[in-house]
């Protein structure tokens, strides 16, 4: 693994060096033509682009008649600036021995690249993306070379089935953006990401090992809606959909968490719904409520998504619907929900208060049924054991011969004639 990694690094450094160097007497990296680069505090060499290498030239600052370096300096077509600083930046002119213009050069100072900061994230279980940023500002034109490879364990079956593990280029999307995307990744595999920062003064590489399970972070849910429940002044119904980027497959589902709060209340209440909707039963009557949701892999892989944009809803101010009893002896008036500021308590309803999406009753019923089933089973086992023991004792009483002296003290025995009286 280490040899493959070092080999990949050597290839990328070679490519970066090729980008920096050229075969002409004045290597041109990229950027505007005629621009050459150096590092502050270091010696900088400028070369005259319009002459043959080694031809003596004279150097001037643009717009200044003062000679900086004459043709007899022995440096040929090059100009040497010792310990360059910001005052040395600008345009330089080189002239041949006959005074003809050899060319113009613009000096720009900056720093070599440092290892970039790289992070990766997967919005689904098939693709992931990596982003990067420079760890220090170089002040020079910068490019990034990005690639990845699949990590394998020596002797693993997966390696025997797929000997090719890369490296492959990680396409930057869009081109030139600080982001690349890996498509068709394997959920249970690990990958090594290589991001190399290149500028005219060198190259620096960052390697990052990632696992799709650990970097999984879905996009937030979409289509969040908050609606009132007619007739229930303390209830709100929230519904949403899966994020469009998450493939709907039965083996890769999402779970959700929902937060809500009344207006002007800073604290959020949190619940974890069982599906794609939730009924809030403790809303504050008459106040608008903010609601938001986030998503996560249902097996807790990765992390929670960011929160969805907030949606707002206000509980219903209508009356609770009532039914007249079948026997018709009780005449009831329409029940009006009291206003929020009214000191009078609400009138009790004659009908049971339904609880939407409240599964506690069903859970209790299941628990009672399970308990009754266990007790019935234990009773049957005890009865079977008692019956078996009784049958065994009865069979033993019929087949076995009585032991000597058994019941002798209870049953009298007639004396034979002539037997002496003891």
Curated annotation (Swiss-Prot):
Domain Fibronectin type-III residue range list: 112-219, 220-317
Ranges facing Cytoplasmic side: 392-422
GO molecular function, one term: cytokine receptor activity
Gene3D superfamilies: Immunoglobulins
Keyword Disulfide bond: yes
Any single GO CC term annotated in Swiss-Prot or TrEMBL for this entry: extracellular region
Stretches in topological domain Extracellular: 24-370
Signal peptide span: 1-22
Subunit structure: On IL11 binding, forms a multimer complex with IL6ST/gp130.
Summary of the function given for this chain in its UniProt record: Receptor for interleukin-11 (IL11). The receptor systems for IL6, LIF, OSM, CNTF, IL11 and CT1 can utilize IL6ST for initiating signal transmission. The IL11/IL11RA/IL6ST complex may be involved in the control of proliferation and/or differentiation of skeletogenic progenitor or other mesenchymal cells. Essential for the normal development of craniofacial bones and teeth. Restricts suture fusion and tooth number.
Identification of the protein by name: Interleukin-11 receptor subunit alpha
């Amino acid at each position: 693994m280490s040899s493959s990694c070092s080999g990949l690094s050597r290839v990328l450094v070679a490519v970066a060096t090729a980008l920096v160097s050229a075969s002409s007497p004045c290597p041109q990296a990229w950027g505007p033509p005629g621009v050459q680069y150096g590092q502050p505090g270091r010696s900088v060499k400028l070369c005259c682009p319009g002459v043959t290498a080694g031809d003596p030239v004279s150097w001037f600052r643009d717009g200044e008649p003062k000679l900086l370096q004459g043709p007899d300096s022995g440096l040929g077509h090059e100009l040497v600036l010792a310990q360059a600083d910001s005052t040395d930046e600008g345009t330089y002119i080189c002239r041949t021995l006959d005074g003809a213009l050899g060319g113009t050069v613009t000096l720009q100072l900056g720093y070599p690249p440092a290892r970039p900061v790289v992070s990766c994230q997967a919005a689904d279980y098939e693709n992931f993306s990596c982003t990067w940023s420079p760890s220090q500002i170089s002040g020079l034109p910068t490019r990034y070379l990005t690639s990845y490879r699949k990590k394998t364990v020596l002797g693993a079956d997966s390696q025997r089935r797929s000997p090719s593990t890369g490296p492959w280029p990680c396409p930057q999307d869009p081109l030139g953006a600080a982001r690349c995307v890996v498509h068709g990744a394997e959920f249970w595999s690990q990958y090594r990401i290589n991001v190399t920062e290149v500028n005219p003064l060198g190259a620096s590489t960052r390697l990052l090992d990632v696992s799709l399970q650990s970097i999984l972070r879905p996009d937030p849910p979409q289509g969040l809606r908050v609606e009132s429940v007619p007739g229930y002044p303390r209830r709100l119904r929230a519904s949403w959909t899966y994020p469009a980027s998450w493939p709907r497959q039965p083996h890769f589902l999402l779970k959700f968490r929902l937060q809500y709060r009344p207006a002007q209340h800073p604290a959020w209440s949190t619940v974890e719904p069982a599906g794609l909707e939730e009924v809030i039963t403790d809303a504050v009557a008459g106040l608008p409520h903010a609601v938001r949701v986030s998503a996560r892999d249902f097996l807790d892989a990765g992390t929670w998504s960011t929160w969805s944009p907030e949606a707002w809803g206000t509980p219903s101010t209508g009356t609770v619907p009532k039914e007249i009893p079948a026997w018709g002896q009780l005449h009831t008036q329409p029940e009006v929900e009291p206003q929020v500021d009214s000191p009078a308590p609400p009138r009790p309803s004659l009908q049971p208060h339904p609880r939407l999406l409240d599964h506690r009753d069903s859970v209790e019923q299941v628990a009672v049924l399970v308990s009754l089933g266990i007790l019935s089973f234990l009773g049957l086992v005890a009865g079977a054991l008692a019956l078996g023991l009784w049958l065994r004792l009865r069979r033993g009483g019929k087949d076995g011969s009585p032991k000597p002296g058994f019941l002798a003290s209870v049953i009298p025995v007639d004396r034979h004639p002539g037997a002496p009286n003891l």
